[in-house]
Design a protein with these regions (language model features):
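Acidic/polar, low-complexity linker and loop regions
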Residues: 40-45, 81-82, 86-89, 245-252
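Short, flexible coil/linker elements and helix-boundary hinge sites characteristic
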Residues: 21, 32-33, 46, 96, ...
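Accessory, charged alpha-helical segments in nucleic-acid-processing enzymes
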Residues: 155-252
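Mg2+/Mn2+-dependent nuclease catalytic core
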Residues: 50-164
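Metal-dependent nuclease catalytic cores that hydrolyze phosphodiester bonds in DNA/RNA
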Residues: 1-79
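Alpha-helix boundary/N-cap detector
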Residues: 8, 12-23, 148-158, 203, ...
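Solvent-exposed amphipathic alpha-helical surface segments
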Residues: 31-38, 121-124, 167-174
């Protein structure tokens, strides 16, 4: 991928990677101080201290009751700390503008992802809401800005589960009835469920969505029949891989 991208700048990539590594080392020293001076500095910042020997990287977990499986970046075996890392940009941090809905700098998709991970731990281990220190780490930025404490927002967690259930139900319906029954729903207006009309959406997101969806509505009858048949087959295969299939049935 990098060899064929004319925009790729290896020097900048190397510099950015070194900065990320430096920031990560600082975060480790804050959460898991190795010396007395580091521990004092963390305490001065109001940071809780955690046992480095209990830290585990990228543990995988599954919760059948919630229908969630995932892999978090860092946690401790005593379930006192949960950290999800994001290496990309966060414009809230760069512009010093908090999210108006949450009064903090985290981005909602990342917040939702972390809440779902925490929901699994809470359900599987019967944890109280104040048992786990939940953190989002934007490692592109120094820890003072990028290491964020986030709260367990139960309303947002329930909304995420509800939205996931709606997606699953829609996927089952399309797989059963055929993709042609949903083709007309693939428009920017329908997909923009939040009704966003800000500059970023109209300048960047909407053109990308239109580039994908607009050709779907200009297909010839033969092209549409082939495309819908293929999409139905692919979706059914995906559903079978996730939930299994009854013996004796097929996806043809």
């Amino acid at each position: 991928e990098f060899c064929t991208c004319p925009w790729f700048d290896p020097k900048k990539f190397y510099t950015d990677a070194r900065l990320q590594a430096f920031n990560l080392q600082q975060v480790v020293d804050i959460l898991f101080p190795r010396t007395a001076s580091q521990a004092q500095m963390s305490a001065f910042r109001g940071e809780s201290l955690y046992d480095r020997k209990k830290a585990i990287l990228e543990p995988s977990f599954v919760c059948e009751a919630l229908g969630i499986q995932g892999r978090v970046d860092l946690m401790t075996t005593d379930c006192k700390l949960l950290v999800e890392q994001k290496s990309g940009r966060n414009m809230n941090i760069e512009t010093h503008q908090v999210d108006p809905g949450y009064h903090s700098y985290q981005l909602e998709p990342h917040y939702v992802q972390l809440l779902l991970y925490y929901g699994v731990l809470q359900h599987n281990f019967k944890l109280s809401n104040d048992r786990v220190n939940i953190r989002l780490l934007y490692s592109k930025y120094r820890p003072q800005d990028g290491l964020m404490v986030v709260a367990y927002y139960q309303k947002l967690f329930k909304e995420a589960i509800q939205y996931r259930n709606q997606l699953v139900a829609a996927s089952f319906e399309i797989a059963k009835e055929g993709f042609e029954h949903a083709l007309n729903e693939f428009t920017p207006e329908v997909l923009n469920v939040a009704g966003t009309q800000d500059f970023f959406y109209n300048k960047y997101l909407k053109p990308q969505i239109e580039a994908i969806t607009k050709p779907l509505h200009t297909l010839s009858p033969l092209e549409e029949a082939y495309f819908c048949r293929m999409m139905t087959f692919v979706l059914r295969e995906q559903m079978i891989s996730k939930v299994g299939a009854q013996e004796g049935t097929n996806t043809s």
